[in-house]
Amino acid sequence: MAGFDWFWKALGGKSGRNQKRSVAIVNQAENHVAELDALDDVALAQRAKDLASGGRIDNHAEFLAILGVASQRTLGLKPYPAQSQAVLRLIEGDVVHMATGEGKTLVGAMAATGLGLMGKRVHSITVNDYLAVRDAEWMRPLVEFFGLSVASISEKMDAGERRQAYKAAIVYGPVNEIGFDVLRDQLITRREDAVQHGADVAIIDEADSVLVDEALVPLVLAGNQPGHAPRGKITDVVRSLKENDDYTIDDDRRNVFLTDKGAAKLEQQLGISSLYDDEHVGSTLVQVNLALHAQALLIRDIHYIVRDSKVLLIDASRGRVADLQRWPDGLQAAVEAKEGLAVSEGGKILDTITLQALIGRYPMACGMTGTAVEATNQLRTFYDLHVSVIERNHPLKRFDEADRIYATMAEKNRAIIDEIALLHSTGQPVLVGTHDVAESEELATALRELNIEVSVLNAKNDAEEAQIIAEAGDIGRVTVSTQMAGRGTDIRLGGADEADYDEVVKLGGLAVIGTARHRSQRLDNQLRGRAGRQGDPGLSLFFVSLDDDVVVSGGSGESVSAQPDATGLIDSDRIRDWVGHCQRVTEGQLLEIHSQSWNYNKLLADQRVIIDERRERLLDTALAWEELAQHAPARAAELEDLDQSVREQAGRDIMLYHLDYNWSEHLALMDDVRESIHLRAIARETPLDEYHRIAVREFKDLAQRAVDDAVSTFKSVTIDHEGAHLDDEGLARPSATWTYMVSDNPLAGSGNSVISGIGNIFR
């Protein structure tokens, strides 16, 4: 562990002591194996149940040994000591740092099984459907060996199938699907309609991706309601505007500003006197802003693709199509109009929850990732989670070459192609990590012009993902991919069957090339980690240009001088240090955004807990009827002839409708407040303090408003043996609902809504 001495000092002594204790327990576990091997399956399973009875483990060493012996019997996989150590740290609630290819799937299953034997219900959270289904089926024999049940959740399952799956002791599911089920369950009016049954523990695969990169991505449940969609005329007029003449874009390409000339052109072609008129500020101006953002800032094959006449967003952190994501506030419709497609229906947000708040619902959370160390501060700050570093089973043999830095993007791109061609000429397999679909396809085209066969993995063909990755380590393979995080399939040298393993080892193993630095070193390391698996040789190399986004953004306002050679290469440690500085600046910016966003979101998360508790009481007791009868005794007396169960359910339907409606209105109000909160600084008010003041004030009256509204409805609505006829009062719940994730909005400033930009489209 000497290589991580700096890490333990930075983190404090507790993690170091835990690591030493874990290593000692794993060493002791080996002493139990011979005795346990002699037991039959029934006796072995019973021994584990005895050790974990009462919700705690009496002998950790023997317990780990039992899990290991069972793994070998059921899966043919004997865990390495490092894997057993990781299992122990997960059971004790840490995030474990395990390198790619070190066997996280088995570790997660062993930990889930151990926690299940302790009587805990476990959700094993993955980043996509494929991994959830694969891992549940792969690990099923181990889990069922101990008499525990296991199931998986996927997007295409209906409510009945989900309800049955959630009854299992261990449930594998994508984080978004689990979150959507939480939201749907917040609309039920009968307990038996709930699909989830609660869980005690979340084991999170790719923990840094879920807990850091996507922590503040809102999951949304929406119902039918028209939204802010740009009219066709506005889309056509905006399409005619010229950059730098009619509008300008800031250096980060996150904001677009109309010039006076552009505003005048819009007013003339739309036949209006001023975009500032009251009649246009909340309608035409919003639609112009949406259309302009869609036209100028969202680029096809970078931010989205078009497939089967639909706009599909690209998840930047995973490099694949995000089937369930869409942009908010009419921006989705604006992009569809820009592409000449049918414009999708708008909707009212009924409820929303961030991934960070979702994970906060679990009494215990732990996780695994190959890049936990780099996320230590965020995990500690936002989740109070500790990181345990698990040493590799074999020493790392990968060679990480120093960055090759070029003066211009064009010079860098030529050098990348030359390097790939050189490596390919030897037969060494090459994996190239790009940042978006457009870049991956342009690079593949350039390589094919050199008669180099290329496999491309990006958002357009992610259905072929597992096969492409599995063969990426074969002789002569060149694979060009977007973001590799969460791909879930190991790259084995010599191909999926490792038939040419020895020859690829002689060639130097897998060569990984990054076409640019990412916004954080952690993402760079996710790509690097694809080479050098399980002690294999490998190479990693990043190409950088002074035109790259991370350099331009992180070095904003700074100047640097360098002397490139004839090819544009800048061989200078000083410049490499400066590029590293630029990356650290962008990392700091991301952390600041996360901190600010969490400060705004946390109060709403706390208020959600109060709403949830109120909802639970209304669902599970006769409280709704009792409160309505107390406030309107005469009306209650009129209904005495009805069955008590009918009266109580009618009360629930009425009370829950108005509680849900008022909560939805509160979310909409606070979103509007947040979008304009930056204006408070002009009035010398602290924006965050003012936001909290408004949130507390508005929420204080929410419960009473919901009760008052419910009492009013109770007095007027028809209630008979069929229940409360809310539809007749115009109080029907939406006839259709759908779920989606709000994309990490490239356009948002202090808030989540594109509408916040309407004050900034004029300089």
Curated annotation (Swiss-Prot):
SMART domains membership: SecA_DEAD, SecA_PP_bind
Cross-referenced Gene3D superfamilies: Helical scaffold and wing domains of SecA, P-loop containing nucleotide triphosphate hydrolases, SecA, preprotein cross-linking domain
Catalytic activities: ATP + H2O + cellular proteinSide 1 = ADP + phosphate + cellular proteinSide 2
Matching Pfam families: P-loop_SecA, SecA_DEAD, SecA_PP_bind, SecA_SW
Membrane-protein topology: Peripheral membrane protein
Source organism, top-level taxon: Bacteria
One GO molecular-function entry: ATP binding
Family of the protein in this entry: Belongs to the SecA family.
Protein name: Protein translocase subunit SecA 2
Originating species: Corynebacterium glutamicum (strain R)
Gene, per the UniProt record: secA2
